[in-house]
Structure formats: structure tokens, C-alpha cells
Regions:
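Extracytoplasmic catalytic/substrate-binding loops of multi-pass membrane glycan-assembly enzymes
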Residues: 54-69, 78-98, 108-120
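Membrane-interface transmembrane helices that cradle and orient dolichyl/undecaprenyl
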Residues: 156-158, 195-211
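Transmembrane-helix motifs of polytopic, lipid-linked glycan transferases
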Residues: 18-22, 123, 135-157
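Loop-to-helix entry region of an early transmembrane alpha helix in multi-pass inner-membrane enzymes
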Residues: 108-119, 127-145
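Short acidic/glycine- and proline-prone juxtamembrane loop motifs at membrane-interface regions
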Residues: 181-186
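Membrane-interface alpha helices of multi-pass inner-membrane proteins
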Residues: 176-177, 211-231
Length: 312
């Protein structure tokens, strides 16, 4: 972080808080209103804390490496806009003579999932004059909107548990620390919240179906692009929920009894095919999962199980 973080980040923070304030009436009710800005404050604090820990304790690390790569794209956009746009639109790892003077200096150019956060930071840099803390604030705000959307869905299902849901969604230190800064986890947390919201209101409750299904699709795309295993966990759970919802509405007992084995016979091969297609070319594919497990086991043996990872 630099002097411009101190000068510019507060301006963008004020903008985000004003935006949140203008939307509060539509996003809250009499029970949840008091948690709205608490949730946002914790996300913003998490963004600051993560940056400080990585800068002053670790002297660098993932978040600053992501920022480093996004700075290269931002500089390309300033120097040669057509080349910068090409970097943003090229498939990561593409050997393009026009972009190589920039991409050769990027740490994560060959990593498709990591380039999502790198590109997001570069695009935000157009607005924020590529200021680390301002970029982190925007990402934290996205995470906040997703988590708040999920909280609204939870409260709609179990209104009397609004206090417990508030604690679970907003106040867990590890969640608002790791899910608020310039990290891949921030995008995934926000996307997961929006996916749950879109699925519940669009598919289960059938409210504003088109809008909510589009939200669901966009959130699922982002999840699978950044951390595919999160989407792999969400989709089966959502499918089971949907099946149980329809099964409960069936009036004939025999039909209800026969539905489970029939659905399992259909769902298992479709599920396996879907997972295979989703993970194709990643280290979570059926062909690579054994090697991934072996690598993780060897690393844990070397580190004495002392390593920490949020996944790739």
C-alpha cells in the first residue's frame, strides 16, 4: 500500500457507503436493518486487515502478487489500450507476440482461475487509479452484497433465527477476514451468496424467475471459473433441495415412494457427466484428482501438516 491508498481509498469507501445507504430500505426489514451496516463494516475492516497482514507481517504474498499482475494489465491499458484489452480477453496462457512484453512479467498469466481476480482488479483500476485498498474495498463490497443476499434468503426461510443467521453470515472472523480482500475467496463468497439467493427465490419460491435465474447462472459461472469445487458442492445440494420440494408436493404416496430410485437412476450418470465436463482440464478432473491428492499429501508430509490453504 502507498500514499495514494490513504488519499483515494476513503473517497471510494464513502461512495460505497452512500450506495449501500440508498439501497438499505429495499434490502432490510425491521428485524435485519440493524445488521446491514455491521455486515458492511466487518467486510471493509477485513479488506484493510488482510492488506495490512500481508504487507507488514508476510511482506508480500498472494494478494499483492495478484495486485502486481493487475498493475501490469492496467499499465498496458494506459500505454496501449488495444494490447491491454487483448490481455483481458485472451485465454490465460496464450502466447501472443503483441501481449508478451507485458504477460512475460506476470506471475499468474498461465493460471485461468487466478487470472479472474487479476483481471477484475485491473478493470477496477480504471476507476480507482489502480489503488490497492480501493480495489479491495470494491471486492469487499461485492462479497458483502452476496453474503447479505444469502442472509435475506435464510431469514425468509426461518424468520425467527435472524440473530443466529446474522452471527453465522457476518461475524465469523475467519470468514470476513479471508472473504473480504483482494483474493479469489472474496469473489467466491460473493458468488456463492448470490447463487443461493437466486436459486431460493427464483427456483424454490418462483419469484421474479427470469431475474433470479440469471443471477444464479452468473454466480455459478463465476464460482466454476474461480474455484470449481465450490460449484460442485453447491449444485448437488441445490438439486436435492429442489427434488425434495417437488416430492413433498406429490399427493400420491406410491408416486412419492417411486420418485427417489427413479431420480437417482437418472441423476447419477447426469451428475457424473456434469462434474466431468465442469472439471475437464483442471486438477480436480477425474484424470487429475489422484495426482492432486498425492501432491497435497506429500506437501502435508513435508510441512508437518502445518500448511494453510483455501484451495485453488
Amino acid at each position: 500500500m502507498e500514499l495514494k491508498d490513504v488519499l483515494l481509498a476513503p473517497i471510494f469507501a464513502v461512495f460505497l457507503y452512500v450506495w449501500a445507504y440508498l439501497r438499505r430500505a429495499k434490502q432490510t426489514n425491521s428485524l435485519t436493518k440493524k445488521y446491514y451496516f455491521l455486515a458492511l463494516n466487518l467486510r471493509m475492516f477485513g479488506a484493510i486487515a488482510l492488506g495490512f497482514v500481508y504487507q507488514f507481517y508476510y511482506n508480500g504474498g498472494d494478494t499483492y502478487n495478484f495486485f502486481h499482475d493487475s498493475l501490469i494489465i492496467w499499465n498496458a491499458l494506459l500505454d496501449k489500450p488495444d494490447v491491454g484489452i487483448q490481455i483481458l480477453t485472451d485465454t490465460p496462457g496464450t502466447l501472443n507476440p503483441a501481449t508478451q512484453p507485458y504477460t512475460n512479467y506476470m506471475y499468474f498469466y498461465v493460471d485461468k482461475s487466478t487470472m479472474i481476480i487479476v483481471k477484475a482488479s485491473a478493470v477496477l483500476g480504471i476507476i480507482t487509479y489502480h489503488t490497492y485498498l480501493a480495489n479491495a474495498f470494491f471486492l469487499a463490497f461485492f462479497s458483502f452484497t452476496g453474503v447479505w443476499a444469502m442472509y435475506r434468503a435464510f431469514v425468509d426461510i426461518y424468520p425467527m433465527l435472524y440473530k443466529r443467521f446474522a452471527f453465522a453470515c457476518f461475524m465469523m472472523p475467519s470468514a470476513f477476514f479471508w472473504g473480504s480482500g483482494l483474493m479469489k475467496d472474496t469473489l467466491v463468497v460473493g458468488a456463492l451468496g448470490w447463487a443461493f439467493y437466486g436459486f431460493y427465490f427464483g427456483v424454490i419460491k418462483k419469484q421474479k424467475i427470469l431475474k433470479n435465474v440469471l443471477i444464479l447462472i452468473a454466480a455459478l459461472w463465476l464460482m466454476q471459473a474461480v474455484k470449481i469445487y465450490v460449484a460442485m458442492c453447491f449444485l448437488p445440494s441445490a438439486s436435492i433441495w429442489l427434488f425434495l420440494q417437488y416430492r413433498a408436493n406429490m399427493k400420491v404416496a406410491l408416486v412419492r415412494a417411486l420418485m427417489l430410485p427413479i431420480v437417482l437412476l437418472i441423476a447419477l450418470p447426469i451428475g457424473l457427466l456434469t462434474v466431468s465436463k465442469l472439471t475437464e482440464g483442471t486438477r480436480y478432473s477425474f484424470d487429475s484428482i489422484g495426482e492432486t491428492t498425492k501432491t497435497n499429501t506429500e506437501w502435508n508430509a513435508v510441512s508437518g501438516n502445518a500448511s494453510y490453504s483455501l484451495g485453488e
